[in-house]
Amino acid sequence: MINKIHGKVIEKKESSLVLMTTVFEFELLVSAFCLANFNLSDKVELFTYLYTRENELKLFGFLNSDEREIFKELIGVSGVGPRAALRVLSNIRYNEFKEAIDKEDIELVSKIKGIGKKMAGKMFLHLQGKLLINSELESTGLFRFKELEESIVSMGFDRKIVNSKIREAFNLAEFANLKDSEKEQFLFKEVLKRISN
């Protein structure tokens, strides 16, 4: 899985950015908020999601892992494709969308063109209680290990379980005695071991 792309913006289109990396050029479909965030020649880092179907292969780019996580949850809703998911994230910022879900503000989402109350209702039913913004790690003092969390989640593991196992490993006496340079490798191995058990 392609987790992130680092590159230079060489073209801005209506709903995508073209990035030049060391070797390749990538076109990434992005939300309107993401598009507005960058100018030509900017050096950027985008989280990515590769959408694959029989006759379709598209790469989506996101400002951060939270925006990507919401996108992934949205396309898991029956009847919501990647274009509709991106339309939602182009009309409501990802943190505002999370807040709307928590407050059951269906009206806000249903006003988006092409969504409507029925589809918004399906989204709310599917997403309530599933969205994590800035990761639970931030509230536990473990935010510096967020990249480690992302690496393990990108391997296909559930984010909540990964968060839980990182906290467990973090609280081990063995972890406290390690040098800073050794801690991330220890956490990675320990978390994978605990998830597999």
Swiss-Prot record:
Region (Domain II): 64-139
Statement: the UniProt record of this protein carries the keyword DNA-binding: yes
Coiled coil regions, renumbered to chain: none
Annotated region described as Flexible linker, given as residue ranges: 139
Predominant localisation class: cytoplasm
GO cellular component, one term: Holliday junction resolvase complex
One example of a Gene Ontology biological process annotation: DNA recombination
Top-level taxonomic group: Bacteria
SMART domains: HhH1 (SM00278)
Annotated region described as Domain III, given as residue ranges: 140-197
Compartment(s) where it occurs, according to its Swiss-Prot or TrEMBL record: Cytoplasm
InterPro entries: DNA_helicase_Holl-junc_RuvA_I, Hlx-hairpin-Hlx_DNA-bd_motif, NA-bd_OB-fold, RuvA, RuvA_2-like
Keywords: Cytoplasm, DNA damage, DNA recombination, DNA repair, DNA-binding
Chain spans, region Domain I: 1-63
Function: The RuvA-RuvB-RuvC complex processes Holliday junction (HJ) DNA during genetic recombination and DNA repair, while the RuvA-RuvB complex plays an important role in the rescue of blocked DNA replication forks via replication fork reversal (RFR). RuvA specifically binds to HJ cruciform DNA, conferring on it an open structure. The RuvB hexamer acts as an ATP-dependent pump, pulling dsDNA into and through the RuvAB complex. HJ branch migration allows RuvC to scan DNA until it finds its consensus sequence, where it cleaves and resolves the cruciform DNA.
Membership in a protein family: Belongs to the RuvA family.
Subunit organization: Homotetramer. Forms an RuvA(8)-RuvB(12)-Holliday junction (HJ) complex. HJ DNA is sandwiched between 2 RuvA tetramers; dsDNA enters through RuvA and exits via RuvB. An RuvB hexamer assembles on each DNA strand where it exits the tetramer. Each RuvB hexamer is contacted by two RuvA subunits (via domain III) on 2 adjacent RuvB subunits; this complex drives branch migration. In the full resolvosome a probable DNA-RuvA(4)-RuvB(12)-RuvC(2) complex forms which resolves the HJ.
Entry-linked NCBIfam families: ruvA
Name of the featured protein: Holliday junction branch migration complex subunit RuvA
Organism for this UniProt entry: Borreliella burgdorferi (strain ATCC 35210 / DSM 4680 / CIP 102532 / B31)
Gene name as annotated: ruvA
